[in-house]
Amino acid sequence: MRVVLVHPTGSNWIPGRKDISATANRMAPLGILSMAAWLGAAGTDVAVLDFLGPGAPVGIEAQTRSILAGKPDMVGISATTSSYLDGYELIIKVKRQVPQVR
């Protein structure tokens, strides 16, 4: 099984508020990194995509392509309040293109 774990980008989706999401969420995604280590030790083929990290693809379409390039059987999203909408949109796009992905 191939698992891709994703740390999505995000933004302030409240109109009129300053957007500090990229700064506030710029941290190592320790939760999915821990899960990846455990899954890898158990023999699962796992990848972590940190879309807030350096060199990450920009935009939902490019990020969806990046996820699908890993040919996942399962995709996991780790999201905060500011990134859950991007995470949700990524999952919708992945499932539309490859419905059998869990």
Feature locations, PLM:
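A short, structured N-terminal alpha-helical element that caps or precedes a catalytic domain
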Residues: 1-102
